Amino acid sequence: SSISLCTPKKPFSILVPLGPEPLFIDLQDALLENRFKKISFHDELIGAQEIWSRGDDFVFLGRGRFTRWASWAEVGIANAGTATEQLVGLGVPVLSLPGKGPQFKSSFAIRQSRLLGGSVVPCKTSESLAERLNFLLNEESVRRSLGKIGSNRMGPAGGSIALARLISQFLELN
């Protein structure tokens, strides 16, 4: 798994905000294979439902925690277009790994990366994702540069509200 290939120079924490799937039990084997041990079932402060540790490294699992955790990230890993764009808008560089689903194919990831100025880096394999993740975690200046490019491309917060107001005004006039 990719986590076994992740070797940053300092201790790390991985925040895993989950949707309805996968189930926590589905992730358990990969964590155990990589010598992580479950240390807690719930943490109010962070909002994790499960916490796993391996020495000074931690994995936090939480269902529905994306909004809360996204701004804490140094690097994002995503396989969904909207989550990727939300992270980029927060100034977080993202590694994308196209999945098996119809909504996120390699061609989409490449176009998305181009539109977002390279702040999203599409990866074709788990190995290339781990290699790029290690690089970004160890190179703060590159992370900051990519984060700045991404947040500039996405623009400031509030775009959806402004667009809704414009549409509402247009509809009132017609």
Which residues does each PLM region occupy?
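Nucleotide-activated sugar donor-binding and catalytic core shared by glycosyltransferases
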Residues: 1-174
